[in-house]
Amino acid sequence: MDVSIDFAGLKLKNPILTASGTFGFGLEFQRYGDLESLGGIVVKGLSLKPREGNPMPRIAETPCGMLNAIGIQNPGVEEFINKKLPKLPWKTLPVLANLYATDAEEFGELAGVLAGEEGVAALEVNVSCPNVKEGGIAFGQDPKQITKVAEAVKKNAGNKPIIIKLSPNVTDITVCAKAAEDGGADALSLINTLSGMAVDIERRTPRLANVIGGLSGPAVKPVALRCVYQTVNAVKIPVMGLGGITTAEDAAEFLLVGAKAVQIGTGNFLSPDTAFRIAEELPKVLERVKAESLDEFIGSLKLPK
């Protein structure tokens, strides 16, 4: 079955991408599979300047998932452009950059740096970062700030599609989705991690140095599915689903509720070949459930009467 798809102007050979922060810059996973067998990769979050990230420990295993508080450790956008991007097969593999910033103006500046890079297919904007100018509340929890960030990035991004990555740590994710759409976003990706924590009762200490981290993995999949389903029915722009996908069947569930593409995140930590395996198995799963085509299957959920 042909599983190629157009996502917000991106020509994807299949709807399977990797999630930012779980696949490095792609180069680290080349030994486990053919990068060009994927629909695309989203590289780890990039900031204008290098970031060391949070102190250790940054990761804690939880039942059916994991908590992380990496703190967007990265070498900075210039290092990515000069040393990482040239090594990627970007002519045949869509490479999406994930943007991290502390205010809307900085997001716009970062988009401007990447706008002229032929090897970057699209910009994914992480609005789960704290807005330093507004008291530290995450952009993604304030619809007005989401619109402002989307506008700032869109203004400077040239012809690159803008994907706003939404946080589930809100009362109504559809309000945030509409805010991103109003700001000119070409697409959405969701969900980012759920806010959580873990403690050690023997030491009486948090298991993360940052105390609070982001929960991901199979535990969050029902929440992610609900968020994608609600969002698809609230906006006109396409949605990329992520959250707890570890099998081709999981990926198909997100497509069924209306996502046009999906991202594999924590599954890459469980087994480094996860994304490659899902990309290979998805056509077989769609054929097994008697889908006429990928387009026919997307959003074909039958609701109770």
From Swiss-Prot:
<dbReference type="InterPro" id="IPR033888">
    <property type="entry name" value="DHOD_1B"/>
</dbReference>
<keyword id="KW-0560">Oxidoreductase</keyword>
<dbReference type="GO" id="GO:0006207">
    <property type="term" value="P:'de novo' pyrimidine nucleobase biosynthetic process"/>
</dbReference>
<feature type="binding site">
    <location>
        <position position="191"/>
    </location>
    <ligand>
        <name>FMN</name>
    </ligand>
</feature>
<dbReference type="GO" id="GO:0004589">
    <property type="term" value="F:dihydroorotate dehydrogenase (NAD+) activity"/>
</dbReference>
<feature type="binding site">
    <location>
        <begin position="192"/>
        <end position="193"/>
    </location>
    <ligand>
        <name>substrate</name>
    </ligand>
</feature>
<keyword id="KW-0963">Cytoplasm</keyword>
<feature type="active site" description="Nucleophile">
    <location>
        <position position="129"/>
    </location>
</feature>
<feature type="binding site">
    <location>
        <begin position="68"/>
        <end position="72"/>
    </location>
    <ligand>
        <name>substrate</name>
    </ligand>
</feature>
<comment type="subunit">
    <text>Heterotetramer of 2 PyrK and 2 PyrD type B subunits.</text>
</comment>
<dbReference type="InterPro" id="IPR050074">
    <property type="entry name" value="DHO_dehydrogenase"/>
</dbReference>
<feature type="binding site">
    <location>
        <position position="98"/>
    </location>
    <ligand>
        <name>FMN</name>
    </ligand>
</feature>
<keyword id="KW-0285">Flavoprotein</keyword>
<comment type="function">
    <text>Catalyzes the conversion of dihydroorotate to orotate with NAD(+) as electron acceptor.</text>
</comment>
<feature type="binding site">
    <location>
        <position position="126"/>
    </location>
    <ligand>
        <name>FMN</name>
    </ligand>
</feature>
<feature type="binding site">
    <location>
        <position position="20"/>
    </location>
    <ligand>
        <name>FMN</name>
    </ligand>
</feature>
<feature type="binding site">
    <location>
        <position position="44"/>
    </location>
    <ligand>
        <name>substrate</name>
    </ligand>
</feature>
<dbReference type="Pfam" id="PF01180">
    <property type="entry name" value="DHO_dh"/>
</dbReference>
<dbReference type="InterPro" id="IPR005720">
    <property type="entry name" value="Dihydroorotate_DH_cat"/>
</dbReference>
<comment type="similarity">
    <text>Belongs to the dihydroorotate dehydrogenase family. Type 1 subfamily.</text>
</comment>
<protein>
    <recommendedName>
        <fullName>Dihydroorotate dehydrogenase B (NAD(+)), catalytic subunit</fullName>
        <ecNumber>1.3.1.14</ecNumber>
    </recommendedName>
</protein>
<dbReference type="InterPro" id="IPR024920">
    <property type="entry name" value="Dihydroorotate_DH_1"/>
</dbReference>
<feature type="binding site">
    <location>
        <position position="126"/>
    </location>
    <ligand>
        <name>substrate</name>
    </ligand>
</feature>
<dbReference type="InterPro" id="IPR001295">
    <property type="entry name" value="Dihydroorotate_DH_CS"/>
</dbReference>
<dbReference type="GO" id="GO:0044205">
    <property type="term" value="P:'de novo' UMP biosynthetic process"/>
</dbReference>
<feature type="binding site">
    <location>
        <begin position="44"/>
        <end position="45"/>
    </location>
    <ligand>
        <name>FMN</name>
    </ligand>
</feature>
<keyword id="KW-0288">FMN</keyword>
<dbReference type="InterPro" id="IPR012135">
    <property type="entry name" value="Dihydroorotate_DH_1_2"/>
</dbReference>
<feature type="binding site">
    <location>
        <position position="217"/>
    </location>
    <ligand>
        <name>FMN</name>
    </ligand>
</feature>
<dbReference type="GO" id="GO:0005737">
    <property type="term" value="C:cytoplasm"/>
</dbReference>
<keyword id="KW-0520">NAD</keyword>
<feature type="binding site">
    <location>
        <begin position="243"/>
        <end position="244"/>
    </location>
    <ligand>
        <name>FMN</name>
    </ligand>
</feature>
<comment type="pathway">
    <text>Pyrimidine metabolism; UMP biosynthesis via de novo pathway; orotate from (S)-dihydroorotate (NAD(+) route): step 1/1.</text>
</comment>
<dbReference type="InterPro" id="IPR049622">
    <property type="entry name" value="Dihydroorotate_DH_I"/>
</dbReference>
<feature type="binding site">
    <location>
        <position position="165"/>
    </location>
    <ligand>
        <name>FMN</name>
    </ligand>
</feature>
<keyword id="KW-0665">Pyrimidine biosynthesis</keyword>
<feature type="binding site">
    <location>
        <begin position="265"/>
        <end position="266"/>
    </location>
    <ligand>
        <name>FMN</name>
    </ligand>
</feature>
<dbReference type="InterPro" id="IPR013785">
    <property type="entry name" value="Aldolase_TIM"/>
</dbReference>
